[in-house]
Amino acid sequence: SPYQAPVQIKYYKIKIENHNRVGKFSLINTAQYQKKEQNNLDTNELSTLNVPEWVTRNTLLYSNYVFNNSLFLQTGITFNFFTKFYADYYNPLLSEFVTQNYKEIGEYPRFDFFVNATIQKTRIFIKVEHLNSSFTGYDYYSDPFNPYRDLSVRFGVVWNFFE
């Protein structure tokens, strides 16, 4: 059942973002360090805020206009990673996330490949998510009891009718 923590929680975060461009290549890096302090009155009490200590997202991409500057092409790969932590689990009966302190998730890399193409007001995209799923074993979760998606492909068209 819901309750309010009887102690103060302190949350600290340092986030660094960097965007480097060399010619038509770009490297976009984001790294975040998080720390939480909670002095529990009872050692059996649940931690009320669970966050990974480190989170990183890095993208290497190539951008260029092709076909006489009529198509803008962008393609690249994205790397995501976070350290192990006690993630809240999703309870479908409550339609809410619930705090838990007994199963950790994290410490697995995730690679995605993408291609975006823009022609006037239309954007076409394709994304291959979790490229490395078959190489890293099948111990990756989005929350403690729900596995993260295996390799999947997303594609679509976005057509803006208004400016």
Model-based region annotation:
Residues 1-163:
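Exposed, low-structure sequence patches enriched in small/polar residues
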